[in-house]
Amino acid sequence: MSKHIAGPEIERLIQLLARIPGLGPRSARRAALHLIKKKETLLEPLGAAIQAAVQKVCICSVCGNVDTIDPCSICTDPRRDDATIIVVEDIADLWALERAKTLAARYHVLGGKLSPLDGIGPDELNIAPLIQRVVQNPITEIILAVNATVEGQTTAHYITDQLSNFSVKVTRLAHGVPVGGELDYLDDGTLAAALQARTNL
């Protein structure tokens, strides 16, 4: 009995889908079958969209975001606050902040976080280009929107130290109780951060 249940093209589709984060082999098979069943309405448009992305998507040379133009749509948006840069670890973090629609600032994607154990030092991240942006532009505030992990906080402290000689305000996202969160369900570290970052009413 053959170990393959379909032709090599379908097997290849399943293998590639299984490499997407959150999709294992079983989910990939289901997704592939769904795409094949909806060939004209889903598989073909998806293939065309992927092909267009391969040809047009690029990394913004200013902030590190992905877009189909360089500089990206955010960097060229005249409605943005040029004096404020939000620093994020990854493009996914940038997109998350954009969904919040709270602050129309500029961004800077580091491309990761400092992690000596993994061999990731300052030279492996986009820290030098961030400093260069501060040197070349009238930046008044850097918002460090890094994750509340040991590596994220180490990265934040390193960047703060690198910016200490510039007349720029460095802030970070508040840590603590999430909206709708109940104290009884929060971990000790989150509660401690919330107490330290308490505000007046």
Curated annotation (Swiss-Prot):
One of its GO terms (biological process) is DNA repair. It comes from Bartonella henselae (strain ATCC 49882 / DSM 28221 / CCUG 30454 / Houston 1) (Rochalimaea henselae). InterPro entries: DNA_Rcmb_RecR, Rcmb_RecR, Rcmb_RecR_Znf, TOPRIM_dom, TOPRIM_RecR. GO terms for molecular function: DNA binding; zinc ion binding. Belongs to the RecR family. Residues 83-178 form the Toprim domain. The gene is recR. May play a role in DNA repair. It seems to be involved in an RecBC-independent recombinational process of DNA repair. It may act with RecF and RecO. It holds the Pfam family RecR_HhH. A zinc finger (C4-type) spans 60-75. Keywords: DNA damage, DNA recombination, DNA repair, Metal-binding, Zinc, Zinc-finger. This is Recombination protein RecR. PROSITE patterns: RECR, TOPRIM.
